[in-house]
């Protein structure tokens, strides 16, 4: 509420507009923005580079990638996994050697204590004139003194073990964060599921005008059509890829034509349900397109 007096208003109420303005300027609080059409990728763009694909490939979850970009991503992830695994093995060896040193030091301490105990044994002469009562009293006194000694030693050891930040020798030390064993599988950057190079499906888009080259095709808004019905493809048209041929068809064509015979119209191969892969589209910018159009950024919160 620091900017309330600087705003062009004489009202005593902290308005919603001022609150949003202060939230954006202060750097505190969760900030949310409603995304528009320009913030949504097209259906034929790579999910990594957000650029139209030259050599598109599709995952089994329906995410479209540029082949070069996704191969570079897989290679980078494998190198990162190798680095993490190397660091984990190094930590494992360090913990193992530390455990061996601790066990050796404990054995050495036990041996030293045993030697001291053996050297401190002194046989006292038995006095024949002492009565059993005095022996019992002596035993009781000895047990009491030993118990008090044990209690005092236990208290002193527990008090010495307490961490004290004002004493340099008793200052608690922060233990290093232990690394977890990294997973060796490369995951998809969009879905998070395991990703393999052999699972990528080559996609063949049917251009709207075959006479145009790629540069001229990219300047148009309507670039590709369905391989069967020749309907224009876009973010507002649900479409799918047929695994055997890799062609892109509309979901309307799949429901009305292809699912009747379950045959690929291009190659003539038999199709299964898993061979029809819907493409994950970016949406149209409208709320009813099925895409979350609200971006949120969680920032520190000022609490009273």
Swiss-Prot record:
Top EC class of this enzyme: transferase
E.C. number: 2.3.2.27
Keywords: Cytoplasm, Developmental protein, Nucleus, Transferase, Ubl conjugation pathway
Motif stretch (Nuclear localization signal): 78-101
Biased composition (Basic and acidic residues): 99-118
Key word Transferase present: yes
Subcellular location: Cytoplasm; Nucleus
Pfam families for this protein: zf-NOSIP
Protein name from the UniProt record: Nitric oxide synthase-interacting protein
Provenance organism: Danio rerio
